Amino acid sequence: MSKLTTGSFSIEDLESVQITINNVIGAAKEAADEKAKDLGPMGPSAWPGLATYRDDWNLKLLDRYEPVITPMCDQCCYCTYGPCDLSNNKRGACGIDMLGHNGREFFLRVITGTACHAAHGRHLLDHLIEVFGEDLPLKLGQSDVLTPNITITTGQRPMTLGEIKPAMEHTEEQLTQLLATVHAGQESAEIDYDSKALFSGSLDHVGMEISDIVQIAALDFPKADPEAPLIEMGVGTIDKEKPFLCVIGHNVGGVTYMMDYMEEHDLTGKMELGGLCCTAIDLTRYKEADRRAPYTKVIGSMSQELKIIRSGLPDVIVVDEQCVRGDIVPEAQKLGIPVIASNAKIMYGLPNRDEQDVDATIEELKSGAIPGAVILDYDKLGEISVRLTQEMHPLREAAGLRKIASDEQMKEWVDKCADCGSCYLVCPEELEIPEAMKHAKEGDYSYLVDLHDQCIGCRRCEQVCKKEIPILSVIEKASQKVIAEEKGWMRAGRGQVSDAEIRAEGLNLVMGTTPGIIAIIGCPNYGDGAKSVYYIAEEFLKRNFIVVGTGCGAMDMGMYKDENGQTLYERFPGGFQSGGLVNIGSCVSNAHITGAAQKVAGIFGGRTMEGNLAEIADYVLNRVGACGLAWGAFSQKASSIGTGCNIYGIPAVLGPHSSKYRRALISKNYDDEKWKVYDARSGEEMAIPPAPEFLLITAETWQEAIPMMAKACIRPSDNSMGRSIKLTHWMELHQKYIGGMPEDWWKFIRTEADLPLAKRAELMKKLEEEHGWEIDWKRKKIISGPKIKFDVSAQPTNLKRLCKGA
C-alpha cells in the first residue's frame, strides 16, 4: 500500500473502498524532516519547545543582563481571588509574588505580539497558496540564505510557499504552549517567564519572516533591491481635487485587489490611493520589483490616523488589521466617510456584506443607511472600495464634508477654553495645550502649530474637556499651512539584505571598521515628536553607521528635509553598506534585520544555521555591532520584536514611555565576574569589556539615546582599528549630547592602538594620572594597566560546548 504524506487526492465512482487516515496533521512536518536529512549539518535545537533554549542560552543571557522590573501598580487583578496587594514582598492568594506577576505581565505582552505576527503570516500564507499554489518559488533576491529565522528555528530551508507550512504550524503550536503558562496556577518564577519571553521573541521573528517572504515572492515586491523606487509621503502629496481612498492597517492582502481594479479600469491617475501604518508601506511595494513608476502614497504613521480623518479628505476608509484605532467608525461617521472592514480581526460590529450584490452594497453605504460594512471577499472589496470612493467624492464635496472647520468655528472653539488645565494633565506627551490656547485667544496660532508634530493624535485631551472643545481639530486647523507642505520621500521597502551585501560588509562589521548597524523600528509614541528619529538617523548616517528602518520609524525618517530640501532617503544610498540608509519594509520586515545579523554569522562566520540558535546568537553578541531603537514603541508587537532581537544578542533602546512594558535587561557593568567568556581555542576563561552593557533599556531623551546606542555597538571581538573607530564615535557623541567624557571609557582599552587616534596622547595621560596605568612615553605604548588582554585571534564564546576539546 502506498503512503500519502502531503498533497490532495479524490476518489470517484468506486465501491467498497476503505480509507485509513492516521497522522495527517503531522504529515507536513514528517515530509520536512525527511527533506532535512539532505541539508547537511544540523544544530542541537531544531523544532524547539518551551525549555529548549532555557539552559543552553537564555539563562546565560539573563545571568549577565538581569531583569529590572518596573511595575505599573502594586496589585494583581488576574483572577477571582484578587485583587491582591503584592507590595512589600507580599504574595497573592495564589502564591505569586510581585516579580512573578510582572514577569507574567511582560511575557503576556510578548506572546500577544508574537501571535499577532503569526496570525498575519498564517492569513497571508493561506491566501497566497490559494491564489498561486504551494509550488510558487520563494524568489527573494540574489541570495542562497532565504529564511534565516525559519532555518535557525526548524532546521529547514523552504524553497516554495508550501514548504513554509511546517514552520508556520510549529510557531502556532508553540504559541499555544506559551499561552497556557499564563493561566493562574502555572509558571510563577519571573526568570522563567523571561526565558519564555525570549523564546516567544524568537518565534515572533519566524512569524514576521513568513509574513514578508510570502508577500515578496507572490506579490512582486522589491527583492533585496537597494535602488527600490522613492515613494511620495505626507498629507501634502494628496491631490484634494481627486477622490481619495484611504487604507489603514498592516495586512496588504486586500489592498492589492483595489490596486488591480484601479489598474484594470485606468483609474490610477484619476483618484488617490494612500495609506497609514504598514499597509501604506506594503501597498507601495506591490509590483515594484521592476521599479515601475509608483502611484500610491504613504500618508504617515498611526499617530496620523485620527488627524487624517478629521481633515475630511478620505472619501472611503478601508481597515485591515493591527494598530488601527478603535474609534474610526464613529469619527468617520461624523464626516460621512464609509468604513469598510476587510479582515476578520477587526469587524467593528459592522454588517457583513460578502453575500450581497455589489451595487446594492455600494448604494447602502453611499446612502448612509449603514456607517460601514465587513467585506472579506477580496474580489468584491477591490471593486466596492474603488467605485464607492468615486461616488462618495462629489457627494461629500457638495455637503462640505471634505474640509476642516471654518475660521469662525475655530475662533468659537478657542474662545470657549476656560484654561482649567485638564487637557495638560491627561496628555501622554505633556503638551502645553493651555498655554497654546491662551495665545490663540490673542490671535497667535503659532503655539498650536508647534504642538502639531508632537501630538500623537490620541484624543485624550478632548475627553476631559468640560467645554467639549475638539482640541485635536483645533491643533490641525491651526496647522493647515504646515500640513499642506508635509511632503517627504521614502524608499519603498526593499526586503532582505542580500548574501552579496553580507559578504561585502561582514568583515567590516565583525572587525568593527564599520561602526555598527542602527535599526530604527517601531511605533510613533515619541516623547518629543517624530523629528527626533530624523536627528538620530542623520547623526549615525553622517558617521558611516549602517542605518536600517522599518514601519513607522522608516516613514518618519523621511518626513524631514535638510537646508537643501532633501530627505535622508535622497541624501544617502539604499544599500546595506557603510553610510547606507536601508528601508527594509513594514513591521513584518523586521525579521530581515535579525536575519542580516544571523547571515553574518552563517555566511561570513561559517556557523551552521540549521537548528542552531544559541551558537548564532553567541556569535552576534560577541562580534556583530548592532543596536535597535524603538523610540516610539507602544504596542505588544514592539515588545515581541525587541525581545526577539534580545535573544539574538542585539540590544535595543526604547523611548521614555517604554518603562510601561514593565521590564528592562541591564547588566552590572562593574561586576567583573559577569564579563568573562571562554576562548574557544583552549576553553580558558578570558575577560571582556562590558559590551554591550544592556539588552533592553529606556532613555529619557533622544540626546541621551544617541551615545547609548553608539556604545552598544562595541563588541568584544573588535580589532584595534575597529575599537578605536567605535570609541571615537561614542566619546564624541557623549561630549556633544551629554557633555564631558564617559566615566568608563578606559574599561574598553586593551592596547594603545584601541585609543582614538586624534586624542591618543591626551587619553594616555589620563590613563596614567587617573587610573595608574604604566605608560612608556618614549615608545608611546601602554606597559601595564588593562584588565583585558588583546589577542586578535581570540575566539570569545559564552558556550562551553564550542570550546576545543569540549
From Swiss-Prot:
Q: Name one Pfam family in it.
A: Prismane
What does the record say about how the cofactor binds?
Answer: Binds 7 [4Fe-4S] clusters per heterotetramer.
Entry note about domains: Cluster B is an all-cysteinyl-liganded 4Fe-4S cluster; cluster C is a mixed Ni-Fe-S cluster which is the active site of CO oxidation. Cluster D is also an all-cysteinyl-liganded 4Fe-4S cluster that bridges the two subunits of the CODH dimer. Contains two additional 4Fe-4S clusters, dubbed E and F, that probably transport electrons from ferredoxin to the B cluster.
Record's catalysed reaction(s): CO + 2 oxidized [2Fe-2S]-[ferredoxin] + H2O = 2 reduced [2Fe-2S]-[ferredoxin] + CO2 + 2 H(+)
Segments forming domain 4Fe-4S ferredoxin-type:
407-436, 445-475
What name is this protein filed under? Acetyl-CoA decarbonylase/synthase complex subunit alpha 1
User: What highest taxon heads this organism's lineage?
Assistant: Archaea
Any idea of its EC number?
1.2.7.4
Q: Where does [4Fe-4S] cluster 4 bind?
A: C427, C455, C458, C461
The protein's job, in short, is:
Part of the ACDS complex that catalyzes the reversible cleavage of acetyl-CoA, allowing growth on acetate as sole source of carbon and energy. The alpha-epsilon subcomponent functions as a carbon monoxide dehydrogenase.
Per UniProt, [Ni-4Fe-4S] cluster binds at H250, C278, C323, C523, C552, C587
EC main class here is oxidoreductase
UniProtKB keywords: 4Fe-4S, Iron, Iron-sulfur, Metal-binding, Methanogenesis, Nickel, Oxidoreductase, Repeat
Q: Which gene encodes it?
A: cdhA1
One GO BP on record is:
methanogenesis, from acetate
Which family, according to UniProt? Answer: Belongs to the Ni-containing carbon monoxide dehydrogenase family.
Cross-referenced NCBIfam families, in alphabetical order? cdhA
Which residues hold [4Fe-4S] cluster 3?
Answer: C417, C420, C423, C465
List of residues binding CO: H117
**Pathway(s) where this gene product acts:** One-carbon metabolism; methanogenesis from acetate
Q: Which cofactor does it need?
A: [4Fe-4S] cluster; [Ni-4Fe-4S] cluster
Q: Where does [4Fe-4S] cluster 2 bind?
A: C76, C79, C84, C94
Q: Which GO terms describe its molecular function?
A: 4 iron, 4 sulfur cluster binding; anaerobic carbon-monoxide dehydrogenase activity; hydroxylamine reductase activity; iron ion binding; nickel cation binding; peroxidase activity
Q: How does it assemble?
A: Heterotetramer of two alpha and two epsilon subunits. The ACDS complex is made up of alpha, epsilon, beta, gamma and delta subunits with a probable stoichiometry of (alpha(2)epsilon(2))(4)-beta(8)-(gamma(1)delta(1))(8).
